[in-house]
Every structure is written in structure tokens, then in C-alpha cells.
Amino acid sequence: NDPCEEVCLQHTGNVKACEEACQ
């Protein structure tokens, strides 16, 4: 899994936002 998304989810829990931010 993408480490960016992993970290993002730990902070926000928002999968959609993390996918957008990390693409």
C-alpha cells in the first residue's frame, strides 16, 4: 500500500481525500 496514504489515513481517516492528496 502507498505509504503516503497510510500516513494520511492515520491522520484523517478519509480514504477519498488521501487518494486525491497522494496521487
From Swiss-Prot:
Expressing tissues: Expressed by the venom gland.
Subcellular location: Secreted
Gene Ontology, cellular component aspect: extracellular region
Gene Ontology molecular function: any one: potassium channel regulator activity
Cystine bridges: C4-C22, C8-C18
Location (main, coarse): secreted
Lineage top rank: taxon: Eukaryota
Keywords on record: Disulfide bond, Ion channel impairing toxin, Neurotoxin, Potassium channel impairing toxin, Secreted, Toxin, Voltage-gated potassium channel impairing toxin
Task of the protein: Decreases the amplitude of the potassium current of the rat channels Kv1.1/KCNA1 by 33% and Kv1.2/KCNA2 by 8% as well as human Kv1.3/KCNA3 by 70%.
Family label: Belongs to the short scorpion toxin superfamily. Potassium channel inhibitor kappa-KTx family. Kappa-KTx 2 subfamily.
Domain statement: Has the structural arrangement of two alpha-helices stabilized by disulfide bonds (CSalpha/alpha 2(S-S)).
Protein name as annotated: Potassium channel toxin kappa-KTx 2.3
UniProt source species: Opisthacanthus madagascariensis
Phylogenetic classification of the source organism: Eukaryota, Metazoa, Ecdysozoa, Arthropoda, Chelicerata
